[in-house]
């Protein structure tokens, strides 16, 4: 609740301090904001590549060279891949040690100095830490598999097309893997995507934003034929944060199941998946949640879909069909090997195989940091951090008329409608030139050809001073190449 009140203050209260302060462009001003940052200590818990690191051609460290004083890069790409927590190595080393000295008995043998429970229970530890990040009950969350795999598993359970209801509503510019997953699910049920796939396209191609009213209108237009709506909580290209609560309630009032891809939202904004009554959701953990490339993902199933009571071994009418595997089975009977599937309650009952303990350690290493920082404080800082970057971009150089800007910010300007990411559409032919300048300055961002860059300050490790420098670099390089 705290960050929502904070958001309201930003929207309706006096301007943020840097809006009317000419000093906002100075290093000293940015450093004064950093000095007041309650999350500033967490930056030291991440390994930030140096400019020298980025140019390395070998991985082995030079033991004769002290690179601790090398300037760090400015890493604004946490929306693509988060940085490595320093604790990740400790977690993985402890796992490797357990495997080395215990072998298979490591599944059940506790240790006084363990960071995670024995192998058989690591998924429980992951779910416990993940739940508050996405606003869920612990029983509603499972850390498992990968994002697209989990979307397929969830749609296999929740997409139950009938003769009357068979359509899936999705963004026209959804992340390609989501698009492919929906297409293949429709074909799996012997239907054609051209008939069963409803694409919500931007009304104005120059402004690729989907308004809530537009989404609700599409829901109304397909109310009698849609079985499922699957949207991104935060749109990967524009950075738009959709009104999950309103859209979910409206679609459900029409009898439509609602799922959300939270890849760009988990660890970024303060989600409340349980309170918003979301049917299901899935996300990856390697972006803002820093679990490493291709790291283990997560899924959410609302508690009302997780009941598994049975009588005489038979599942009751409320049991939600799913693709099943032994790790989703009840722990008390899992090793009986009697081929009688008794699922765990909640999201855990959707698990298939035993999880990779190696990957789980990488996830938990980062989640432990989130548990100490809290999503409320992370979101509060993010609102200010992204707002500061936006201010620098739209006002620098001070004497430049707005109509002469060599870029357009296509992310909504309303803080309630975005997370940490700002997407900039550059003028024709500027992309490669701007990227070259930023690379030389050690500024790491993300590109989406032919003309968009995505800049994402992560509250746990980015600073106002970095944004002061990088924001001016971006604006200056754009103008310099444009003029």
From Swiss-Prot:
The keyword Cytoplasm applies. Pyridoxal 5'-phosphate binds at residues 147-148, 175-178, 232, 261, 264, 286, 326, 354. It is an enzyme of class 3 (hydrolase). Gene3D superfamilies: Aspartate Aminotransferase, domain 1, Type I PLP-dependent aspartate aminotransferase-like (Major domain). One of its GO terms (biological process) is L-tryptophan catabolic process to kynurenine. Its main location: cytoplasm. One of its GO terms (molecular function) is pyridoxal phosphate binding. One of its GO terms (cellular component) is cytoplasm. It catalyses: L-kynurenine + H2O = anthranilate + L-alanine + H(+); 3-hydroxy-L-kynurenine + H2O = 3-hydroxyanthranilate + L-alanine + H(+). Keywords: Cytoplasm, Hydrolase, Pyridine nucleotide biosynthesis, Pyridoxal phosphate. InterPro entries: Aminotrans_V_dom, Kynureninase, PyrdxlP-dep_Trfase, PyrdxlP-dep_Trfase_major, PyrdxlP-dep_Trfase_small. Its cofactor is pyridoxal 5'-phosphate. Pathway: Amino-acid degradation; L-kynurenine degradation; L-alanine and anthranilate from L-kynurenine: step 1/1; Cofactor biosynthesis; NAD(+) biosynthesis; quinolinate from L-kynurenine: step 2/3. Its EC number is 3.7.1.3. The modification N6-(pyridoxal phosphate)lysine is found at residue 287. It is found in: Cytoplasm. HAMAP family: Kynureninase (MF_01970). Belongs to the kynureninase family. Catalyzes the cleavage of L-kynurenine (L-Kyn) and L-3-hydroxykynurenine (L-3OHKyn) into anthranilic acid (AA) and 3-hydroxyanthranilic acid (3-OHAA), respectively. Homodimer. This is Kynureninase 1. It comes from Aspergillus terreus (strain NIH 2624 / FGSC A1156). The lineage of its organism: Eukaryota, Fungi, Dikarya, Ascomycota, Pezizomycotina. The gene is bna5-1.
């Amino acid at each position: 609740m705290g960050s929502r009140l904070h958001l309201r203050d930003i929207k309706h209260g006096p301007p943020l301090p840097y809006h009317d302060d000419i000093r906002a462009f100075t290093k000293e001003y940015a450093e004064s904001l950093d000095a007041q940052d309650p999350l500033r200590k967490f930056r030291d818990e991440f390994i930030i590549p140096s400019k020298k690191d980025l140019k390395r051609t070998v991985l082995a460290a030079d033991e004769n060279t002290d690179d601790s004083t090398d300037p760090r890069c400015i890493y604004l790409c946490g929306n693509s891949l988060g940085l490595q927590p320093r604790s990740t190595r400790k977690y993985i080393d402890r796992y490797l040690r357990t495997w080395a000295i215990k072998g298979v008995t490591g599944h059940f043998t506790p240790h006084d100095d363990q960071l995670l429970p024995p192998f058989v229970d690591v998924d429980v530890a992951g779910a416990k830490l993940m739940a508050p990040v996405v606003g869920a009950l612990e029983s509603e969350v499972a850390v498992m598999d990968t994002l697209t795999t989990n979307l397929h598993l969830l749609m296999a359970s929740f997409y139950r097309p009938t003769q009357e209801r068979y359509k899936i509503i999705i963004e026209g510019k959804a992340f390609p893997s989501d698009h492919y997953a929906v297409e293949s699910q429709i074909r799996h049920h012997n239907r054609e995507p051209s008939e069963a796939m409803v694409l919500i396209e931007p009304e104005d191609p120059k402004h690729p934003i989907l308004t809530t009213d537009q989404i609700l209108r599409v829901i109304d237009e397909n109310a009698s034929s849609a079985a499922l709506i699957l949207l991104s909580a935060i749109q990967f290209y524009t950075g738009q944060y959709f009104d999950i609560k309103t859209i979910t309630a409206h679609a459900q009032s029409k009898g439509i199941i609602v799922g959300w891809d939270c890849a760009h939202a988990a660890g970024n904004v303060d989600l409340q998946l349980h309170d918003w009554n979301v049917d299901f959701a899935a996300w990856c953990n390697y972006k803002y949640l820093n679990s490493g490339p291709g790291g283990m993902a997560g899924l959410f199933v609302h508690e009302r879909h997780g009941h598994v009571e049975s009588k005489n071994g038979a599942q009751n009418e409320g049991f939600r069909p799913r693709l099943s595997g032994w790790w989703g089975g009840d722990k008390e009977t899992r090793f009986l090997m009697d081929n009688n599937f008794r699922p765990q309650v909640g999201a855990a009952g959707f698990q298939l195989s035993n999880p990779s303990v190696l990957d789980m350690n990488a996830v938990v290493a980062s989640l432990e940091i989130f548990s100490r920082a809290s999503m409320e404080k992370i979101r509060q800082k993010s609102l200010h951090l992204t707002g500061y970057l936006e201010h620098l971009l739209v006002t620098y150089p001070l004497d430049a008329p707005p109509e002469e800007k060599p870029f357009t910010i296509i992310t909504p300007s309303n803080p309630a409608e975005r997370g940490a990411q700002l997407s900039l559409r550059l003028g024709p032919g500027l992309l490669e030139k701007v990227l070259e300048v930023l690379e030389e300055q050690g500024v790491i961002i993300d590109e989406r050809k032919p003309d968009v860059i995505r800049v994402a300050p992560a509250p746990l490790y980015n600073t106002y001073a970095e944004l002061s420098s990088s924001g001016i670099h971006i604006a200056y390089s754009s103008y310099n190449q444009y003029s």
